């Protein structure tokens, strides 16, 4: 039995033979999977250097890297200490590397923890994920940052609710 629940109606499901996977990613213009062996740092840095988009919006663009959604972009940027409204092309090599590495770390941890159960998400066995227990900024507006004690803020950026620490993630 296969059960698929998508309350917000964002998802689709397709069944592919393993040998068709690469062609599928290319046809859908999906970026690489955020795994060490697939997510090339130099390609990532070059893409950031060419874009004036805010880094949050750029990370949500699935052509850059596949799989990052709103929750995990907030968490990646908090860990990397980058303001979500920063222009992608202004990031230093060190900052771009931090985002790259934290993308791999956050999504790896999310998979390990079974995802984030915020409202209705459960796995195929009906079990809640536990990654939400490890969120540092997402859905933490008006709470203290665990790193510095500053109050977490929530703003709208690119039409998305965006959580960040104004002290740890300074805009400049």
Indicate residue ranges for each PLM-predicted region.
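Flexible, glycine/charged-enriched surface loops at secondary-structure junctions
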Residues: 113-118
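Short Cys/His-rich Zn2+-coordinating modules
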Residues: 103, 122-133, 147-150
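RNA substrate-recognition surfaces in RNA-acting enzymes
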Residues: 81-90, 96
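Short, flexible, mixed-charge glycine/proline-rich loop motifs
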Residues: 132-141, 155-158
């Amino acid at each position: 039995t296969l059960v698929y629940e998508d309350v917000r109606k964002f998802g689709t499901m397709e069944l592919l033979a393993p040998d068709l996977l690469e062609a599928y990613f290319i046809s859908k213009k999906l970026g690489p999977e955020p795994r060490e062996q697939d997510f090339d740092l130099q390609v990532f840095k070059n893409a950031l250097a060419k874009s004036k988009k805010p880094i949050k919006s750029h990370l949500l663009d699935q052509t850059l890297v596949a799989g990052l959604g709103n929750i995990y972009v907030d968490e990646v940027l908090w860990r990397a200490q980058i303001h979500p409204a920063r222009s992608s092309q202004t990031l230093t090599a060190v900052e771009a590397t931090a985002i790259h590495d934290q993308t791999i770390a956050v999504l790896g941890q999310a998979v390990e923890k079974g995802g984030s159960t915020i409202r209705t998400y459960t796995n195929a066995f009906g079990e809640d994920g536990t990654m939400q227990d490890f969120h540092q900024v997402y859905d933490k507006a008006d709470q203290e940052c665990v790193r510095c004690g500053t109050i977490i803020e929530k703003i709208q950026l690119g039409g998305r609710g965006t959580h960040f620490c104004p002290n740890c993630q300074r805009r400049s």
